[in-house]
From Swiss-Prot:
RNAP is composed of a core of 2 alpha, a beta and a beta' subunit. The core is associated with a delta subunit, and at least one of epsilon or omega. When a sigma factor is associated with the core the holoenzyme is formed, which can initiate transcription. One of its GO terms (biological process) is DNA-templated transcription. One of its GO terms (cellular component) is DNA-directed RNA polymerase complex. It catalyses: RNA(n) + a ribonucleoside 5'-triphosphate = RNA(n+1) + diphosphate. The gene is rpoY. This is DNA-directed RNA polymerase subunit epsilon.
């Protein structure tokens, strides 16, 4: 299942929409809830990011993200 993570690189400042970045994770989970938990654990262990929101993507959403040219799976 593919997840899109919205985050701030600087976790010492209040989040601002203008500085929000996104990354994509491909996780082997059975449910969306398991994926959100696993994504938060991976990000906490491997980054200092301030995670704002995590959402699973449908196949159609993945295709749209690929068309925008910014789709790249992040691995830790």
């Amino acid at each position: 299942m593919i997840f899109k993570v919205f985050y701030q690189k600087d976790n010492t400042r209040s989040p601002r929409r203008e500085t929000t970045d996104a990354l994509y994770l491909d996780l082997d989970v059975a449910t969306k809830e398991e994926g959100v938990i696993l994504a938060r654990e991976l990000l906490a262990k491997n980054t200092a990011y301030h995670v704002e929101f995590i959402d699973s993507l449908s196949d159609e959403s993945v295709e749209y993200e690929k068309e925008t040219g910014v789709f790249e799976i992040t691995s830790f």
